[in-house]
């Protein structure tokens, strides 16, 4: 259950009281008490002060998912949020923009080569170090994000997903691997690059789906076609892909 802090002696209490009287049991075992949404200066929003932001206008301008992503990754749900429309613009440009560019990069070269993820999976030990590093980071991310969601920490989960997407996939892997997609022949190295990037994008779509359900669903359908991401299996980390030493050495 989730409600504002003002409902501590209202809705929260009423549900427990009624459930105990009728069913002799508590109504819920986990509760999130939402903080207040303030203006960018930390003042309470009000029509009188003229500092209120129209949520429907923001959704119309940026979309529901960028707005939700900004609010969840900016502060924990139980903390007060200083809302700044510039922050929504930044999230749209950096995270969603980078993610869209990365998908477009993959789609462009895949269409040119007629590539589909139908070929046999290239074994991990036969992939270049760059690919093994990224897959190690991806599987570490899966474990961390799963733990965050299970502990009701969506803010940490969103920040981890965003950092991986922007820093490791877009700014690092794609930039350093561009030439691998240029060759005419479908070499094992090129195949590995395709499979690695595809796997990352597909997994990102699944991991981000609780926070950005519409964008994640579109990304997943564009990649895999067919059913919704919300009907897919939640990704499971492969410990055999995780190489902590490789991750540390690449971080240096």
Predicted segments — roles?
Residues 113-143, 174-252:
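Acidic, turn-prone loop/beta-hairpin segments
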Residues 1-112, 134-177, 181-182, 195-208:
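Structured secondary-structure scaffolds
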């Amino acid at each position: 259950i989730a409600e504002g802090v003002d409902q501590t002696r209202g809705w929260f209490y009423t549900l427990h009281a009624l459930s105990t009287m009728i069913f002799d049991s508590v109504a819920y075992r986990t509760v999130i008490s939402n903080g207040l949404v303030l203006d960018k200066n930390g003042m309470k929003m009000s029509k009188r002060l003229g500092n209120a932001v129209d949520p429907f206008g923001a959704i119309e301008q940026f979309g529901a998912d960028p707005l939700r992503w900004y609010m969840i990754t900016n502060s924990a749900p139980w903390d007060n949020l200083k809302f700044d429309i510039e922050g929504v613009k930044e999230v749209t440009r950096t995270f969603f923009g980078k993610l869209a560019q990365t998908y477009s990069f993959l789609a462009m070269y895949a269409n040119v080569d007629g590539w589909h993820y139908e070929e046999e999976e290239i074994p991990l030990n036969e992939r270049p170090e760059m690919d093994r590093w990224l897959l190690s980071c991806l599987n570490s991310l899966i474990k961390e994000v799963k733990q965050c969601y299970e502990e009701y920490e969506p803010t940490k989960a969103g920040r981890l997903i965003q950092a991986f997407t922007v820093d490791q996939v877009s700014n690092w892997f794609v930039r350093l691997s561009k030439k691998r997609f240029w060759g005419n022949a479908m070499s094992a190295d090129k195949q590995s690059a395709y499979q690695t990037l595809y796997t990352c994008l597909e997994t990102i779509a699944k991991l981000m789906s609780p926070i950005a359900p519409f964008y994640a669903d579109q990304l997943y359908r564009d990649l895999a076609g067919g059913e919704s991401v919300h009907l897919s299996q939640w990704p499971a980390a492969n410990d055999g892909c995780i190489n902590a030493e490789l991750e540390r050495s690449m971080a240096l």
